[in-house]
Regions:
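Histidine-dependent nucleotide/RNA phosphoesterase domain, centered on the 2H-phosphoesterase fold
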Residues: 1-199
């Protein structure tokens, strides 16, 4: 299944459930006692792309102001989650330089690539920009990271939650019941093929 088909399948599955209030809420977003942390290799979009995302988010804010909107500094594509977030993770327990060296090794000889955010999709708890990449470099980087970290004794939890195959960016997360389910779906569909830009 190609990326477009994956994104379409996610929304096709979620849409009827959203309209019948079968959504999920992230109850930890506002929890001051949430101490989970981990290590993730992130890919950040440029300023132009982020500004376009904010323009789209402003449409959602008009109808769903109580939801969680990612700040500019948190908008990203996950390259790969090296250590999945968990409550007792302590950065002082690892040598971060060793992780940096493995990542550098994984990136060595990889060609440049571009990412394009084109359109929105949604699951039961969030709205995402659909990300597309122009060659196989991102897949190669992810596979290199998996292979190179598995050769070490470093703490890691690669693909523990799921095997990452997309290049999406979550930009809105539900933290309360939707006030207007129909309008929410309409905004998603309005921007279903919107070109946020390439970087």
């Amino acid at each position: 299944m190609n990326l477009q088909d994956k994104y379409e399948a996610i929304f096709a599955s979620a849409k009827p459930k959203i309209l019948t209030e079968k959504t999920y809420f992230d109850r930890l977003i506002d929890d001051v006692n949430d101490k989970r942390s981990g290590i993730t290799l992130l890919i950040r979009p440029n300023r132009v792309v982020v500004e376009k995302i904010n323009e789209v988010l402003s449409d959602f804010k008009k109808i769903e102001p109580q939801q969680y909107y990612y700040p500019d500094t948190d908008i990203h594509v996950t390259g790969l989650s090296i250590i999945s977030c968990y409550p007792d993770f302590d950065y002082r327990s690892i040598d971060i330089n060793q992780y940096i060296e493995v990542i550098k090794q994984s990136l060595k000889n990889c060609k440049p690539f571009s990412l394009n955010f084109r359109g929105l999709t949604a699951s039961l708890d969030c709205v995402m920009c659909k990300g597309f990449y122009d060659n196989s470099t991102l897949d190669l980087i992810r596979n290199n990271l998996r292979k190179d970290f598995l050769k070490t004794s470093l703490q890691q939890s690669l693909d523990k939650r799921y095997t990452l195959e997309t290049a999406h960016s979550t930009i809105l997360r539900l933290r309360a019941p939707l006030q207007d389910k129909k309008a929410y779906i309409e905004v998603i569909e309005k921007y279903k093929e919107y070109d946020f830009g390439t970087w």
